[in-house]
Amino acid sequence: MKSVEEQLALIQRGADEILVEAELVAKLKRGQPLRIKAGFDPTAPDLHLGHTVLINKLRQFQDLGHQVIFLIGDFTGMIGDPSGKSVTRPPLTREQVLENAETYKSQVFKILDPAKTEVAFNSTWMDQLTPADFIRLASQYTVARMLERDDFSKRYASNQPIAIHEFLYPLVQGYDSVALKADVELGGTDQKFNLLMGRELQRAYGQEAQVILTMPLLEGLDGVKKMSKSLGNYIGIQEAPGVMYSKLVSIPDTLMWRYFELLSFRSLDEIDSFRKDVEAGANPRDIKIKLAEEIVARFHGEEAAASAHKSAGNRLKEGELPEDLPEIELSSPEDMPVASVLNKAGLVKNAAAARDLLGAGSVKVDGQVVDRTFMLALGETRVFQAGKKAFARITLKAE
């Protein structure tokens, strides 16, 4: 096992916050494998790269010799996480949740080592709680404290309904840490309230409080909003190799460093050398190709990654549009100028680059050269080409 200092440096990589870092150091100094928990509610059947930020961190803990618990929230999934929601989420049936859970297990083991992963379902202990147990659990927190949570307070202030079962969600997630005796819990930055609940409940039930580690929410292909299937700015980990490759090489240049930090297993020194290469004049696309090949290989194998790269290169040489064209959805209250479309979709570095390409006659929409007066209308879907290598099928939806 690596030294405490070496472990801490790796654990800190990409992390937004560690609470409390001194407690983590104390736990590491014991020299015993820690129980590392991360929970996922199977509310949809497919995972995307945004989900893998946490799973990658779990793998890092595995490689450091710690015990990883991949918790499938089949019980909490039927409640629906209210984090960041302005309305009550419709609950799923147990059948829907369990069906989605099966696909999760097959997908996560493309990253995690199955031999070193404990897969748990929170219905295992939650279904065993008696009404008296639930009342004891609910007594550990007050309504006033619940309303300190930003999403609840906003809904309360605007007279939007908050269902009682939504108050139960953070309590149940916190109780999961009690049941699993977690030493560390991972979650996105939007989960901080729920993660802190775990610390409080562990103390209330006579356990040592877990350390919480929050990871950033990965931006989607637009480089602005968090990756989400509903926003259309996602890369699914079960997407075809060519589609995944095309999407990754089409991300904005500035976004690739974020993706390297949160998705790549390369060393920080190697990533820093890539950054210096770009600053010295290297083509950013060449660096994005390295990222795309690494991630496609992780989910589909080295051969598929090499084939995706070769196919993309052949199509570009022949001037053909890619068959696996990236699909991007943008939103706006009104029709959008072509320069804004190119910029927001990440087909160019910035608005100035879009204007330069338009002035040079190097922008095509559905195969036809357009100038800066072109507007993408609300509800339309068009194929955009910026220069020789940047392509995307873009849909403009009304906000």
From Swiss-Prot:
Protein name as catalogued: Tyrosine--tRNA ligase 2
Keyword Aminoacyl-tRNA synthetase: yes
Sequence motif 'KMSKS' region, location on chain: 226-230
Pfam families in UniProt: tRNA-synt_1b
Organism of provenance: Pseudomonas aeruginosa (strain ATCC 15692 / DSM 22644 / CIP 104116 / JCM 14847 / LMG 12228 / 1C / PRS 101 / PAO1)
Similarity field: Belongs to the class-I aminoacyl-tRNA synthetase family. TyrS type 2 subfamily.
Keywords: Aminoacyl-tRNA synthetase, ATP-binding, Cytoplasm, Ligase, Nucleotide-binding, Protein biosynthesis, RNA-binding
Superkingdom classification of source: Bacteria
